[in-house]
Each structure stands twice: as structure tokens, then as C-alpha cells.
Amino acid sequence: MHDKYLIADDWGYILGGRNTDNRFLGYYKESYNEDRDLLVYGEKPGQGSSFQALEAYFHEIWNQPCCKEFDAKGGIGGLEQCCERVKERYPEAFDRIYSKEDWEKATMETRGIELWTNPTEPENKEPVVWERMIAAMEGEEDILVQTPYMICSRKMYEDLRSVCEKGARVDIVINAVESGTNPFGCIDYLNQKKKICQTGVHIY
């Protein structure tokens, strides 16, 4: 699985594309890759529809026959020791407990959040997410898509062309090739950039 999310009790969750290693987290190098993370929380703990959907998704993955527990050395004791070392090194990160007002100032209210996923079985999958994306684009004038990489099938090219021909402006934001960490995604974009642009989308 390539999912990256952190559920905090029944309060909220962080969802993003950032890998949990030193290339993406912390300040261990002079420069490191930045990625987008979303903090989502609700007024009523555990009641938001997207929060409930993410929890259900976690249990769906966790309970699949192909999954098994990882036998980590050290157990919870090693994790607690690591936490203490972090507190010693970065005490300022633990000095302040944020209030409800702090969170409200730092965030914005949404009209709703939906989490979509393809089938989770470890086998060839139907492109459920793509079909939902195309359906959501119907009748819209301005469409913004953010994705790390863009590798299209023949049908995806056809779908994008169809959306643009109906008058929609489609802007797609991808990772910079110069700093991308997925060589296959970067190379495919460079090879197919002209073909992508010929569908009518604007890519950045």
C-alpha cells in the first residue's frame, strides 16, 4: 500500500503524500523534499463523514487475509524512548498545547470532504477513482487536479479530451521533474507531455 495518513484518536487526521523517512520529515539535511499534507478535524469528535470513512478504510485494509502483523523489535518501549529523545531535542514543540481557537485560526471550514479509493484487493483493479473523477468534472467550468505524477492510459487521454471539448478549463499540477523521487513517473511525463497537452488540459 502507498497510503499515508495518521488518525489521532477520534479527533481528526492528517492525510498527505509525504513518505515517513528523513527525506521528507524533520530537518536532517540542508534541503529535503516538501509535500502537501492536509489536517482535517471536526467540531464533533469522530462524527465527520470523511473521518468515519478513513477509519472504515483502515479496518478494511487491516482485516484483509493478505495482511499480517509486523514483528517489530523493542515494542512500545522503544517508541516511548524515541519520544523522550525528541522531547529533549525539540522542547519547543511540546511547550504549548493548542486550543480550539488556535486550530480555528489556522484552518478553514470546508463544504465537505470525500475520500475515494480503488478496490483494495492485491490484484488488478478497476479504475473506480478515475471514473468518479470524470463524473465529478461533468458540467464544471474550472477544474483543478493536483497529483504527484501523471501516467495516462488511452482511455484517460480520451476522457480528458472529452472534458476539455465540452468547454471546461482543466488545470493539472504535478511534482517538478527536477525534484521528483519517482523516476518512472518523471520519465513518462517527459515522454508524454505533448500528448497530454493535446487533450486540452493546462499542466504545471
Positions of PLM-derived features:
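Charged, low-complexity intrinsically disordered terminal segments
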Residues: 1-204
